[in-house]
Amino acid sequence: MAVIKPFKGIRPPQELVEQVASRPYDVLNSEEAREEAKGNEKSLYHIIEPEIDFPVGTDEHDACVYEKAAENFKLFQDKGWLVQDDKENYYIYAQTMNGKTQYGLVVGAYVPDYMNGIIKKHELTRRDKEEDRMKHVRVNNANIEPVFFAYPDNAVLDAIIKKYTSQKPAYDFIAPGDGFGHTFWIVDQAGDIASITAEFAKMPA
């Protein structure tokens, strides 16, 4: 069985989402992130690639850079650029690119499921990159960016996704960085939350 749980997401207010949104940290280098974040103090790059707040050439793995990530994460929350939800939810996230849309559930995953093979590895990753992101998670006590998993076709989950995606989303915008459409819904009804948890619990791996 796969163990998942809802969580209190920390996310931007609707009116700030386009300013906060960024591309994944691993699709661009420090200088590209520095350029995309130029003039935008609300860009998530200040958290996921905090070396941009230091002089060019600063070692991105220096302890002070990780400390800056934590400092910026706290600053974003203090200023209301990132706000934690009051209750635990699941979320639905859709990406639209080249005329095609893919939907996913945003959930809290159970790390031991990854370690014991319930969650299957789908790619070979570099150890240095893994260490970097683990340090980032530890210093922030938060996973700032999602990790994508796949799961088998499931009619119950499909129905829940269809139910929410037929409603007005919390966010719906085209990101300036990648030109992709990003749409986001909040799964906040107790029955739906319980159903999602139960369906994943039925999955052997």
Ranges and model annotations:
Residues M1-P204:
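A cross-family signal for N-terminal binding/gating loops and helix N-caps
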